[in-house]
């Protein structure tokens, strides 16, 4: 696992910073990435360990490096957030430490991959449906499973944040509607990004000057950038901006008149009081409002178990939001922010993890 753009990665950073504030001595080991600087600025030591690959040589190197870190730093608790770190940590049974994990998503269990997964002494799931997945697929005892949320920094993601730097950097027109989207641009994450690119020309014919600000990097970024450039060429203007990987996600969100995305990114946009269309690779919830809260919470705003996203649904909901009056959009945005304050604070996320640590220790 690395620390590039992603919901689990941001979860780790926010949790680490909150635990550090509460007096815990925090160390983070990962393959590195754009969020390392944020950890270092918070006074958190980071170790580069190749925990992002099943390559046998690199896994052996990770095994040796983790053993050295655990022994030299006298680590009491190891908290793993992905399959490979969990597997490697689980091989250190002989060392005296407490081992816990987080389940951020549902893993592929085919081809023996199930047996690479070690959930530790206790595991904390980020939604109720992932808790059930652990019980059904791994026979994890229910008493060993805790449930938490993705805690959001409501000062960092606030309606008071300005997006003016982003407007200038990318030459956007702040007098025309802007749709923001944030995700890793990987094949298993970027379906909705591609759908937005595919509907851009159709929406351009209905909404004068509409712009799409799409943030994130990954293995399909170049392919999507090529498609976006082709759309811009046909429209003879900069309709779609592909930013690549960014750490200033709060400013990307601030620029948008509305936001499209899932999971932590959707929650961050809600915290910024933006109207949000919840859509991702696993499904489609649509325009977030009070009637969507229950289903969204059940699957951690990831849309698991919902109808699939498609171009028509996206087009209709984008048109509906952009055409809505200012009060309707403001009400949707402020309702979303209220939901974050009530259910998704960083403080609650840290409290949940501390309870697990204390029970396992």
Predicted regions: what they are:
Residues 158-172:
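A short helix/loop element that forms part of the nucleotide-sugar donor recognition site in Leloir-type
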Residues 80-86, 103:
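Short His-centered aromatic/hydrophobic patch
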């Amino acid at each position: 696992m690395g620390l590039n753009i992603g919901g689990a990665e941001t979860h780790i950073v926010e949790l680490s910073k909150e635990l550090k504030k509460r007096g815990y001595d925090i160390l983070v080991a990962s393959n590195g990435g754009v969020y390392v600087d944020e950890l270092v600025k918070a006074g958190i030591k980071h170790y580069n360990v190749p925990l992002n690959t099943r390559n046998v040589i690199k896994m052996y190197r990770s095994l040796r490096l983790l053993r050295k870190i655990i022994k030299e730093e006298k680590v009491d608790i190891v908290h793993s957030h992905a399959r490979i770190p969990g597997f490697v940590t689980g091989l250190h049974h002989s060392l005296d430490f407490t081992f816990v994990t987080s389940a951020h998503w549902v893993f592929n269990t085919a081809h023996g991959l199930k047996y690479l997964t070690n959930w530790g002494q206790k595991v904390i799931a980020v939604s109720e449906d992932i808790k059930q997945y652990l019980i059904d697929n791994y026979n994890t005892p229910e008493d060993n499973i805790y449930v938490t949320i993705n805690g959001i920094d409501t000062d960092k993601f606030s309606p008071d944040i300005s997006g003016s730097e982003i407007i200038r950097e990318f030459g956007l027109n702040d007098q025309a509607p802007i749709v923001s989207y944030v995700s890793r641009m990987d094949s298993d994450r970027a379906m909705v990004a591609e759908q937005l690119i595919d509907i851009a020309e159709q929406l351009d014919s209905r909404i004068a000057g509409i712009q799409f600000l799409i943030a994130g990097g990954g293995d399909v970024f170049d392919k999507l950038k090529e498609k976006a450039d082709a759309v811009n060429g046909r429209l003879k203007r900069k309709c779609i901006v592909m930013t690549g990987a960014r750490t200033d996600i709060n400013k990307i969100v601030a620029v948008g008149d509305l936001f499209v995305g899932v999971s932590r990114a959707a929650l961050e946009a809600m915290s910024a009081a933006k109207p949000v269309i919840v859509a991702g690779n696993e499904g489609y919830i649509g325009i977030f409002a009070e009637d969507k809260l229950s289903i969204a919470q059940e699957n951690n705003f990831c849309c698991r178990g919902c109808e699939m996203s498609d171009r028509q649904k996206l087009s209709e909901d984008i048109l509906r939001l952009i055409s809505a009056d200012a009060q309707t959009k403001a009400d949707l945005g402020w309702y979303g922010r209220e939901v974050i304050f009530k259910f998704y604070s960083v403080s609650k996320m840290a409290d949940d993890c501390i309870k697990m640590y204390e029970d396992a220790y």
